[in-house]
């Protein structure tokens, strides 16, 4: 289970550029849940993922994953617990290394052992099988550098890499936004399969209302650094994109400060 309790994040604290990115955010997610996250730009979506990954340490509140308080543990300390796939396909892998070497690094994430153990004969066979399952023909290119691949191929491999270290939590930060429609559809189908196979607790940030409804079993909306909409079960079932957009607009209307409040 993931618990975010009264999370506050302030960037540039005490400076003229001070900005509150999260403000008393509360969110509880059951093990194995697949939650889609929507919200306007600046709502705090990526910051929330950063707090879960350990990239961003909250100025207030508590973060619990699997019953462990990880609030002050950084990214390296959470590497075995949390995997993340970013919007930019180039971010999640090293272009100068081969496909096989990238997979080996991912498998060794959070462990003290180096690449030697991760590149054993048994591991190599496993890597090849995992890549072959993508049906992209990359199993015959395991020695190719990652920077020779397309963005979609790299993103598909980033998803596979996210499953290799036994992480409990998968964070997806608009991971199809930079892909063409066909590849985005392929990556989402792959996402659904891997999440189900590995029973990953998943948070997926997306600007696509269609994706927000088609995937997962719960949708939350952030605005002003807080959760302002949370729909699941019967309340979510049957919602159309138009319904969700209307709910989105209503939340913005009723949670945005008035001109008078802004002046104060």
Where do the PLM segments sit?
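ABC ATPase NBD coupling module
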Residues: 15, 69-83, 91, 113-116, ...
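Conserved ABC transporter NBD signature motif
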Residues: 61-69, 229-231
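A short, flexible loop at the N-terminus of ABC-type nucleotide-binding domains that lies
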Residues: 1, 10-24, 74
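Conserved beta-strand-loop-alpha-helix hinge in the C-terminal portion
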Residues: 226-250
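Conserved small/polar residues in nucleotide/adenosyl-binding loops
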Residues: 254-259
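The feature captures the beta-strand-to-loop junction immediately N-terminal to the Walker
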Residues: 38-40
């Amino acid at each position: 289970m993931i618990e975010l309790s009264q999370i506050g994040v302030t960037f540039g604290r005490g400076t003229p550029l001070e900005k509150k990115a999260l403000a008393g955010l509360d969110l509880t997610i059951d093990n194995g849940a697949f939650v889609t996250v929507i919200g306007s730009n600046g709502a705090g979506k990526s910051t929330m993922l950063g707090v879960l990954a350990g990239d961003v340490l909250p100025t207030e509140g508590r973060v619990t994953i699997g019953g462990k308080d990880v609030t002050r543990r950084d990214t390296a300390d959470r590497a075995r617990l949390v995997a993340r796939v970013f919007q930019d396909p180039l971010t999640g892998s090293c272009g100068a290394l081969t496909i096989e070497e990238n997979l080996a690094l991912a498998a060794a994430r959070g462990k003290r052992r180096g690449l030697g153990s991760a590149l054993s004969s048994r591991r190599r066979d496993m890597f090849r099988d995992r890549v072959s399952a993508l049906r992209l023909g990359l199993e015959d290119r395991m020695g190719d550098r990652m920077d020779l691949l397309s963005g979609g191929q790299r993103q598909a491999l980033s998803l596979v890499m996210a499953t290799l270290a036994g992480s409990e939590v998968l964070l997806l930060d608009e991971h199809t936004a930079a892909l063409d429609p066909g590849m985005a559809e392929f990556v989402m189908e792959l996402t659904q399969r891997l999440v189900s196979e590995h029973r990953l607790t998943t948070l997926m940030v997306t600007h696509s209302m269609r994706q927000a409804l088609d995937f997962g079993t719960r949708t939350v909306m952030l605005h002003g650094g807080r959760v302002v909409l949370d729909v699941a079960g019967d309340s979510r079932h049957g919602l159309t994109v138009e319904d969700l957009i209307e709910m989105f607009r209503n939340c913005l209307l009723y949670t945005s400060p008035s001109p008078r409040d802004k002046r104060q």
